[in-house]
């Protein structure tokens, strides 16, 4: 027989084993999470009250200069894209010439009080600026359009003389690019600069530009030439349809000295640019 003491010990031992196998209740974490959330919200509010004004001012400043950032970024993308085809040096040179061209538009637009956007650079297309308000007459349209080719021509001449003085084939190639782009832009068809310039002379001159563009598109099948041709036809059609509109008639009324200024400027820029191209291909 077992003694009572041993039985009690066995029973007590079994009880202790069973008790140890019961699941223990974990302490609640709800309060801890709630306290942590409240502390985080409080810290965020304190940060916003103390540093929020500075952050807001910084964001507004960046927004103010976002147009410069966008223009600069598109310019970098254009250089990077061209570098894959032409190398970094030539890519920098031709994009610089395009930037100078667009700067001419900006300067002339600011000179007559016309608000315009910063240039947006598009690889294998060029660059463009948008007018935030339409020109009030053909004179204003012509002035803004003249700025780009004029600046581009001056930049091309500077590159030409620099290349000749230093014997740099790279700079000479950049000069040729500037002359060629300037001459191409002087074709009298909208939306090219030449088409906008001759609005101060006579929209009938667009017919010459349309013929030249049609011939070029036919022989090259260039998508850019085709697009320019279609846009030129569209504007010519609009102008023809509005020929009896009194307001549109006023738009094309310019003073004699303005017409003379535009005509002489157009002839000089186109002629010198053609001479520059002839130096390389003639």
What residues fall within each predicted segment?
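Hydrophobic transmembrane alpha-helices and their immediate loop junctions
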Residues: 1-282
